[in-house]
Amino acid sequence: MSSSFFIPFLVSQILLSLFFSIIILIKKLLRTQITVGTHYYISVISLLALIAPFIPFHFLKSHHFDWILNLGGAQSALSQTHSTDKTTEAIGQHVNWVQDFSLSIEQSSSKMIDSAFFAVWILGVAVMLLATLYSNLKIGKIKKNLQIVNNKELLSLFHTCKEEIRFHQKVILSRSPLIKSPITFGVIRPYIILPKDISMFSADEMKCVLLHELYHCKRKDMLINYFLCLLKIVYWFNPLVWYLSKEAKTEMEISCDFAVLKTLDKKLHLKYGEVILKFTSIKQRTSSLLAASEFSSSYKHIKRRIVTVVNFQTASPLLKAKSALVFTLVLGAILAGTPSVSILAMQKETRFLPGTNVEYEDYSTFFDKFSASGGFVLFNSNRKKYTIYNRKESTSRFAPASTYKVFSALLALESGIITKNDSHMTWDGTQYPYKEWNQDQDLFSAMSSSTTWYFQKLDRQIGEDHLRHYLKSIHYGNEDFSVPADYWLDGSLQISPLEQVNILKKFYDNEFDFKQSNIETVKDSIRLEESNGRVLSGKTGTSVINGELHAGWFIGYVETADNTFFFAVHIQGEKRAAGSSAAEIALSILDKKGIYPSVSR
């Protein structure tokens, strides 16, 4: 997946907005076919889906929308004219294979655009946060100026109402000169604030008001109010979020009205409607960002509340059954769809370890030498134990660069495109920045000099459909084949160091059930050297963006007389992040652990 923020986030918003549009349509079509409570709960759970883009569903995968993501991810083109010779000096005795052969990727201005949109979004969030805090200063002012109710008759009525709805949490009942309509706020310590002048209301009318506000407290509607404010801050740019939030607030009041009507005697139903109208006539103007529940509503929505009162009747078993069915279907759709939205919005896919034998060690000094960050993963076959440095980097996905050529070669062999003894390809005369590339190649020379044009030609002969099937069958990283010939260079295909180690082990043990002769051929092509009876095999990879070293890989394994160690190093930085650097880090760590001693030490 792309490391871009804006495009994946935008795609998630498009998908969520489409989902919200469908939900709104369903609610309108089924307005009288489901209960008022179901309408409210559907709105709430639909809005809960907006959390999904920020939830890391690490163990779920979705490829339904990869084609959309690729519109904005890693928009780059392979540039031969801007290729940069980044060949470094060899490391000690490894002079024969530690070199950086790589073509530069010319990255478009998408990162600048992405950063600009990200800045605009953050600015909008900051403005909305300030506006929300300012709007909710009213609650602080009300608290400072409230007067605790000490009227015995009113307190008696208040406690009677609490008993009727079986609600026993402590609630502070107060009055304030700053409001004209009853208001409720607070979660841990709920407040019900009445207007200062309550003499105009009869006992029955006051009972209607108290029951309504107490139901808000009992149902913890204040949590929903805070949640709706948070959504408006984060998704300030999405009109559907604002619309659905407003609907949820109205339906919250309607469902409270319905609960009150079920509690009241039927003869008081008309009185309840009159109370709603009375407070609406004196409603004061308040902000939609206020994290509180007001008894009064806007004139536009008061009609819906009055219709609920006039048409009130207890839900029939059939209506309850239909409501339960619709709610279950909507909930199922949300649970099924939100992991995909989460993966779309994540900047970098991460795969965590399952319940395995893992130890963490600090190898930061080896990475600090190159002023770069990175991750290291080692797997001990005999002990079935992982050793990891930097869990986050080791389980995050990156473009595989030339390390993918190991599996490109394997597929070409399996497909019959080449064989061990017949893998020759003729150079077409195109001038490349490395003399090793400007000549005919076979599998072994191409793997040794990491000749990109050779493996691109193999991929073209294999075909896109076969490549897609292959990537999925071996579960290579994110399995994203999007840009023919360039997908392992431009970042659409990505894999983590942990996944590199695991797939190398599967390759080594032939868990793919390929021809063993093809496995052995690839093993021979990546065999690097032998030291003290131990054999080192592996492949480096270097990412060069806009002519600058960007990242480096070194993956491989060490065979001893009685064990095999699989490893992967990924390094990224601004100056010295290359395959040769990753190789030096890996060899230093392997030497320190006594797995592959350096000849020079």
From Swiss-Prot:
MF (Gene Ontology): penicillin binding
Tell whether Membrane is among the UniProt keywords: yes
Extracellular-side segments = 1-8, 53-115, 340-601
Highest rank taxon of the organism: Bacteria
Q: Per UniProt, what is the membrane topology?
A: Multi-pass membrane protein
Pfam families named in the record: Peptidase_M56, Transpeptidase
Here the disulfide bonds are none
Q: Which InterPro entries match?
A: Beta-lactam/transpept-like, Beta-lactam_resp_regulator, PCN-bd_Tpept, Peptidase_M56
The record's SUPFAM superfamilies line, in alphabetical order, gives:
beta-lactamase/transpeptidase-like (SSF56601)
From the record, give the transmembrane residue ranges: 9-26, 36-52, 116-133, 323-339
Query: Which UniProt keyword terms apply here?
Result: Cell membrane, Membrane, Transmembrane, Transmembrane helix
Tell me the segments the record calls region Beta-lactam antibiotic sensor domain: 354-601
Q: Name one GO cellular component term.
A: plasma membrane
Q: Which residues lie on this side of the membrane: Cytoplasmic?
A: 27-35, 134-322
* Active-site residues, Swiss-Prot/TrEMBL: S402
Q: How is it modified after translation?
A: Carboxylation occurs on two lysine residues. Carboxylation at 'Lys-405' activates the active site serine residue for acylation. On acylation, the lysine side chain experiences a spontaneous decarboxylation that entraps the sensor in its activated state.
Q: What is its main location?
A: membrane
What this chain does, per the entry, is described as: Integral membrane protein involved in sensing of the presence of beta-lactam antibiotics and transduction of the information to the cytoplasm. Mechanistically, activation of the signal transducer involves acylation of a serine in the C-terminal sensor domain upon binding of the beta-lactam antibiotic. In turn, a conformational change occurs and the signal is transmitted from the cell surface to the cytoplasm.
NCBIfam families in the cross-refs: blaR1_generic (NF000326)
Q: Which family is annotated?
A: Belongs to the peptidase M56 family.
Q: What is this protein called?
A: Regulatory protein BlaR1
Gene name of the record: blaR1
